[in-house]
Amino acid sequence: SSDLTVSKFYEPGAFAEFFSGSFTFIADAIDSTPSKVDLLLECVQRDIPVISSMGTGNKLDPTYLAVEDISGTSVCPLARSVRKQLRAAGVKKGVTVVYSKEPVQRAEAGEVPGSMVFVPASAGLLMASYIVRQIIAENS
């Protein structure tokens, strides 16, 4: 919506400011690696179910998207960075992610990785589907 104004972004250490109360699930689509890792660590420490979207920049084929534990990811540079930082904090597995197995297409020097709307949108749909299926399974 053109009327929407984002006044705050999640930053490391801001969990309590953004999330009070209890949650059934958190869906993460943060682009900043330090903020993403902080949120994931907070969710793990608080035992809050979370699914995190990894990089969809410079991707063209949503059929390469997969839902897996962070420990099983490959190809995706963002997943590699997040996995390394989580491991350094003592978290080796237990964080579910959506990531692309599509071969990496490097952006030109100085360019921001672009994305086709259907790849991040498909990642979001996979996340939503995963959350709904987990809630149904938990309540069955």
What does each of the following model-derived ranges do?
Residues V6-F15:
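Conserved SAM/SAH-binding loop
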Residues L4-V6, A27, I51, T96-V98:
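Hydrophobic/aromatic beta-strand patches that form the interior of the parallel beta-sheet core
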Residues F15-G21:
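Short, well-structured alpha-helical segments in soluble
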Residues G13, L60-D61, Q105-A107:
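Generic structural signal for helix capping and beta-alpha/helix-loop junctions
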Residues F25-I70:
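ADP-ribose/adenylate-binding Rossmann-like module
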Residues F9, M54, K101:
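Residues at the C-termini of beta-strands that transition into short coil/loop
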Residues G21-S22, S32-S35, Q45, V50, ...:
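Glycine-rich phosphate/adenylate-binding loop
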